[in-house]
Amino acid sequence: AGEECDCGSPANPCCDAATCKLRPGAQCADGLCCDQCRFIKKGTVCRPARGDWNDDTCTGQSADCPRNGLYG
């Protein structure tokens, strides 16, 4: 509990491996919507459409790539 990021790799520039907390100024450490310790801007495709699924896009508020669901 209390971990903000995966402290498995001391090489991660976004995460302090000793404390498992994000480094100062970092918004995220990993994830499809995280780039260079920052959230990727809203609307950026993080998982392209496949079959009956829409493109999944970043929210701008999270490092996760949410499932946007089936075509309407």
Swiss-Prot record:
Expressed by the venom gland. A motif (Cell attachment site) lies at residues 50-52. SUPFAM superfamilies: Blood coagulation inhibitor (disintegrin) (SSF57552). Residues 1-72 form the Disintegrin domain. GO terms for cellular component: extracellular region; plasma membrane. The keyword Secreted applies. It is found in: Secreted. Gene3D superfamilies: Disintegrin domain. Disulfide bonds join 5-20, 7-15, 14-37, 28-34, 33-58, 46-65. GO terms for molecular function: toxin activity. It comes from the Eukaryota. Keywords: Cell adhesion impairing toxin, Disulfide bond, Hemostasis impairing toxin, Platelet aggregation inhibiting toxin, Secreted, Toxin. Monomer. Belongs to the venom metalloproteinase (M12B) family. P-II subfamily. P-IIa sub-subfamily. The disintegrin belongs to the medium disintegrin subfamily. This is Disintegrin crotatroxin. It comes from Crotalus atrox (Western diamondback rattlesnake).
